[in-house]
Amino acid sequence: MKTHSARKLIPIILLGLFLLIACNFPLKVLWYSPKTAPTLDPAIFGHQGTPAITLQTPGANPLNPVTTLIPFDPNTSVSYIAQSGDTLSVVAAHFDVQPEQITSPQEISSQGILPTGQQLIVPKPAGAASYPVRLLPDSAVINSPCGRDLDIAAAIQGAGGYLNSYTQVVDDETLTGTQVVKRVAENTSTNPRLLLAFIEFRSHWLTQMPESPNLTYPLSLNTPHYEGLYLELSLVAKMLNTGYYAWRQGQIRDLTFSGGGSTGISPDLNAGTAGLLYLFSQLYSQPNFEIALYGENGFMATYRNLFGDPSICDAQIGPLLTSTVQTPVLELPFAAGEVWALTGGLHLDWNTGTPAGALDFAPVTGESRCVVSRAWVLASAAGVVSRVGDGVLQLTLTDENLQPTGWEVLYMHVAGQDRTALGTHVQADERIGHPSCEGGDATGTHVHIARLYKGEWIGAGAPFPLVLSGWTAVPGEKAYQSSLIKGDQVVDSRIDGMYNSQIVR
């Protein structure tokens, strides 16, 4: 059994084409090749009425936490203040040093989340990094409580632009502009304010009525197979998530720009800013990147003009991932005594860009390959059904006082037949629906299970191992290939559900 302390970014490939039982979510095309840098649209960059944004030095950054610092030698070291979600290994990766080279006046956790505000003394990086300003807090990028409070329909209607009357057919269903934004925000767990700001920045559809709207490529991404607002906005979310979670896992230190060229980025950024930088680096050459993101009429100015200062809400809700967050106790999503198979080992929680923290289970019933199974999916913990949709059931976990804990469990490919209704409170092991092929392009009846915490997708392994009924998920060599281990028992994933992939709770 091989394990990995860190994962490389998983190549963006059509894995599902080769699997008997696999997850292909609604965004079917899983590749993206940046094109040459787009020409800056005068209609975008000539837009008036948007206040200028002033570039700040790191010391003046309002997103930097305030703390009392101890002295350090600035000739050899820098002082870094731990942020939401930081671990020692990830901070070391950002600064390109070994974990043992980092010191602190307080004890440093080697595995868990570092306390927010803890001072770390890190060897001084060689040379100055680019783009040191933290632009958006994490809560403004993922679908955190600072995103879920937004009435998307009211925001679009109040802005009075073309998006308010826009409709698009998605998977044989006619969606309004509000429904498109809501679906992308929920599917990818991306903050809807950011999505609306990006739509406005690239098309002005939020506040204006274009004479000849570009219905094929409204966001001007001009990428084959990504036509229409839904797919273009989904692609934006994928690129944003790629940067966000790569930073969260310590897998990115450089930006490579559309059209060529690269630069290192500051090691003390936050994941939200890294995600935004990555997104814009995929769309622009370096000179245009700076204008588009930082310019007087750039994206950040557009965002602030629409929604104000995101750090206000961020301060109200506090850090998202802290050292006090505990992994919830979860059960396997099926009844004791039943035989199911681990058909998909650890793979992407949702789609390209999200971490590898999901598992697939299929009931061993002898039924046809892609039917609504007679077997039942059970709730892995107590909670409230907070979202249902095409194959989707999302459970917001609650404590003994019925208060939300911040944790959520996503079940995908749950059939609409007999599915538990939105708003229903369920107990652990309560029936919530049947596994099926509904939702995306699943190639066999199964259920996909993944976790989120306050809107952030959670991978397996430290600091939040995925444990189901005492079985711990351990990664393998490739996506979908991993094991569940409980004491001396080992269950290996197999796409055909045979041999030692079968598991009894």
Report each predicted region and the residues it spans.
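Short glycine/threonine/proline-enriched tight-turn/helix- or strand-capping micro-motif at secondary-structure
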Residues: 322-325, 329, 340-380
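Short alpha-helical segments in extracytoplasmic peptidoglycan/chitin-binding modules
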Residues: 82, 87-105, 117, 185, ...
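Zn2+-dependent peptidoglycan hydrolase active-site motif and core
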Residues: 372-422, 444-446, 450
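Primarily a LysM-type cell-wall glycan-binding module
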Residues: 33-34, 62-98, 118-120, 124, ...
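Ser/Thr-rich, Proline-interspersed low-complexity disordered segments
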Residues: 23-83, 107, 123-142, 318, ...
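Catalytic glycan-binding domains that act on GlcNAc-containing polysaccharides
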Residues: 132-291
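Non-catalytic cell-wall polysaccharide-engagement segments
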Residues: 26-29, 220-341, 481-505
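Acidic, glycine-rich catalytic/binding loops that coordinate metals and/or anionic ligands
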Residues: 323, 328-330, 371, 378, ...
